[in-house]
Amino acid sequence: MMSKLGVLLTICLLLFPLTAVPLDGDQPADQPAERKQNEQHPLFDQKRGCCRWPCPSRCGMARCCSS
């Protein structure tokens, strides 16, 4: 019984490794990718470093421009 459980656990870990789990959004490894996505967004103003109005949630971590 225990050997069957061990084999099943091994197969599951091979099929679904723990590194395949996505990182949380606040992890430093994720932030450069989000900044790059912000800069590619059509409403992102690169000179001011913020999103123009209307500031969509898809603009990511960038702040909304005040005016």
Swiss-Prot record:
Determine if Transferase is one of this entry's keywords: no
Main location per the UniProt record: secreted
This protein's record includes keyword Secreted: yes
Give the keywords, sorted.
Cleavage on pair of basic residues, Disulfide bond, Ion channel impairing toxin, Neurotoxin, Secreted, Signal, Toxin, Voltage-gated sodium channel impairing toxin
Cellular compartment(s): Secreted
Family, as annotated: Belongs to the conotoxin M superfamily.
The remark listed among the other comments is: Negative results: has no effects (10 uM tested) on the human tetrodotoxin-sensitive Nav1.1/SCN1A, Nav1.2/SCN2A, Nav1.3/SCN3A, Nav1.4/SCN4A, Nav1.6/SCN8A and Nav1.7/SCN9A, as well as human tetrodotoxin-resistant Nav1.5/SCN7A.
Q: What is this protein called?
A: Mu-conotoxin TsIIIA
Record organism? Conus tessulatus
